[in-house]
Amino acid sequence: MSVSSKTSHYDPFRGESSREIALECVVATFIAIAWCNSIELVVLCFTTFKRYGGCYFWSLVIASISIIPFALGYALLIFKIFPSYFSVALEVVGWWGMVTGQSMVLWSRLHLVVHSRRILRWTLIMIIVDAILFHVPASVLEFGAHSNHQDQFNPAFDIFERVQLVAFSVQEIVLSVIYAWAAVEMLKLMPRGQYKGILIHLLVINFVMISMDAVVVGMQYAGFFRLHVSLKAMFYSVKLKMEYAILGRLVHVAAVPVHPLSSYTPTDRSSSVSRI
């Protein structure tokens, strides 16, 4: 169902119930937090990294910047400030960059703990194929849902919107699970007690990220549309901020030699760090 049909009851010039006003305040708060986090993330990208290059850096930059048009587009639509194709285009472009950018961030950091070229290649193919299969049809359906023929597009868009959300959530979960598995394997190579706290912390962060995806999907299927889209923007900004906590610890662990019998040498680790 299109945003316009889901929010047709909203009139900023009419008195609203206390519950409705509270809901709109919550939505506005989530969007504001997402914007603040996005600006902070962009600043961190250009002040934290010594070298402006590499897949990890540019994925972080694109994903961070994309939160702004995504949240802005939906704010214009939800509050009927400027319900037009321009607003739809803003949130569609932002959604592409935010979601696929986040997946590319997750994929890029796999290089620090995953050393199988086959796994890295197939996970990258998964991201590319999913982007084509889900972003393109969803974008076409969404523009159609805001056209003069919205009755023809609304049913298909309502279904596909949920399908793509689940698909991208599963994609991020797959990347997080692969990372968690590889991190545990690395943990087994460490001397007993050494760096366990760091790796456990990384696993907890990944669990929190997966939980955020589950909450977003649940809100979508429960029908809380406005809360869902605003919470989605905020959660993606929070997940990207958590990446900075992961980055420092991953580089620290991956650059340190492990058990002397391990076939993965410190030199290999240094090259993995430089590749992200």
Where are these regions (language model features)?
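Juxtamembrane membrane-water interface segments of multi-pass membrane proteins
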Residues: V184-G193, V253-A254
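Extracellular loop 3-seventh transmembrane helix
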Residues: E24-A34, S84-V99, A138-S139, P155-L175, ...
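Membrane-proximal helix-loop-helix units in multi-pass membrane proteins
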Residues: L110, V114, R118-A180
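Membrane-proximal first intracellular loop
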Residues: M1-W122, M126-A131
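Anionic, Ser/Thr-rich low-complexity intrinsically disordered regions
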Residues: A22, G193-K196, S270-S271
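Intrinsically disordered, low-complexity terminal tails of fungal membrane proteins
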Residues: M1-S2, V251-I276
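A cytosolic-side transmembrane-helix exit/cap motif
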Residues: L106-V113, E142-S147, A245-P257
